[in-house]
From Swiss-Prot:
Assigned GO CC terms: cytosol
Key words of the record: Isomerase, Pyridoxal phosphate
Origin species: Coxiella burnetii (strain CbuK_Q154)
Name listed for the protein in its UniProt record: Alanine racemase
Superkingdom field: Bacteria
Top EC class for this record: isomerase
Modified residues (N6-(pyridoxal phosphate)lysine): K34
One protein family per Pfam: Ala_racemase_C
Similarity annotation: Belongs to the alanine racemase family.
Gene Ontology terms describing biological process: D-alanine biosynthetic process
Pathway in which this enzyme or protein is active: Amino-acid biosynthesis; D-alanine biosynthesis; D-alanine from L-alanine: step 1/1
EC number: 5.1.1.1
Active site, UniProt feature: K34 (proton acceptor), Y259 (proton acceptor)
Length: 364
């Protein structure tokens, strides 16, 4: 079979959650599995992370998918509800809602629910995306407190905009704003994402929201090394993306390789054609020199990424054969490196794996 393969190590996934809980023993872990479990498979990840205290998803469709397969854990929908029909489903399926705008508050006031709703008040401390301003939040909190449709206490949360930056000025300001505005509010608090989890121990409050680190990937990329050793030592990559060599060719000096003739052989040399391309989710903008792993050694990508194939330089691997597995990222080759080469972030690469990639689960 010549399809690219994403191997998902569920043992590594469980291990990473256990490490997170060990590093923050006083906090509950709210596992972020939005965007199809960061590309790893929504249901697969949820079933593997049964020890999580709750799951975070982006939209109601993701939450309902989990309920349909029997996931009974608390689920919080980060974008909340947008109409009465959705709100009724939240109550029916016991879904938690993030409340971030006045329209949602109005819906709560005018809708008769079959059961009360668990909600989290989103306070915008500087992300300037979703949430009530610091000035608005006390009044909204008091308004929600009077609603018979809402379970008490009300959850209180914010989102950090710049926690992966070595300059801590803005994030410290956000945390200060959050603690100040919630000082007189009663309810569980949640502040940190994956980067905040490592960089701001003072913000490890009632609930933490680990995302990318669950999958064994640094939220800091490769440029912020303060936590590099801890992450490499304690966390394991969950996804390994691989594909097979489908052809080996001996090319002459000055022969060009791939579309646009952007790369030419500096000497007579062997090259391999690997069965993966941007149609599988490998980044088209990955430049020549982007590393792949073949038989435990690094080989560089050469030429443009095609829809279905890439070419690699085999001068360091003269004994390579058709059928050999090539690792594009994962175990032995961090996806953060590929993201850096391609001018993007690991999150995007993981979320863009396409349906034609074969997914295999292992326990290792």
């Amino acid at each position: 079979m010549n399809r690219a393969t994403a191997t998902i190590n569920v043992t590594a996934l469980k291990h990473n959650l256990s490490q997170i809980k060990a590093l923050a023993p006083k906090s509950l872990a709210w596992a972020m599995i939005k965007s199809n479990g960061y590309g790893h498979g929504l249901v697969r990840v949820a079933k593997a992370l049964s020890d999580a205290n709750a799951f975070g998803v982006a939209c109601i469709d993701e939450a309902l998918t989990l309920r349909e397969v029997g996931i009974k854990s608390p689920i919080i929908v980060m974008k909340g509800f947008y109409n009465e029909a959705e709100l009724s489903q939240f109550a029916r399926h016991r879904l938690g809602a993030v409340i971030h705008c006045s329209d949602q508050v109005s819906l709560l006031e005018k809708t008769n629910l079959t059961s009360s709703l668990s909600v989290w008040l989103k306070i915008d401390t500087g992300m300037n995306r979703l949430g009530f301003s610091v000035e608005q939040s006390p009044a909204v909190y008091n308004q929600l407190k009077t609603s018979s449709s809402i379970q008490k206490p009300i959850g209180l949360m914010t989102h950090l905009a710049d926690a992966d930056n070595e300059n801590k000025t803005f994030t410290e300001l956000q945390i200060k704003r959050f603690f100040s505005v919630t000082e007189k509010m009663i309810g569980p608090k949640s502040i940190v994402n994956s980067a905040g989890f490592f960089a701001y121990p003072n913000a490890l409050v009632d609930l933490i929201r680990p995302g990318i680190i669950l999958y064994g990937i640094s939220p800091f990329g490769i440029n912020y090394n303060s936590f590099k050793e801890k992450i490499e030592k304690k966390f394991r990559p969950v996804m390994t993306l691989s594909a097979k060599i489908i052809a080996i060719k001996n090319r002459r000096q000055n022969d060009s390789v791939g579309y646009g003739c952007t790369w030419s052989c500096p000497e007579d040399m062997p090259i391999a054609i690997v069965s993966i391309g941007y149609g599988d989710g490998y980044p088209r903008h990955a430049p020549s020199g982007t590393p792949v792993l073949l038989n435990g050694k690094i080989c560089p990508l050469i030429g443009r990424v095609s829809m279905d194939m890439i070419a690699i330089d085999l001068r360091s691997q003269p004994n390579a054969q058709v059928g050999d597995d090539v690792i594009l990222w994962g175990e032995g080759l961090p996806v953060e490196i590929i993201a850096e080469k391609a001018g993007t972030i690991a999150y995007e690469l993981l979320c863009k794996i396409t349906q034609r990639v074969q997914f295999i689960e292992i326990e290792k």
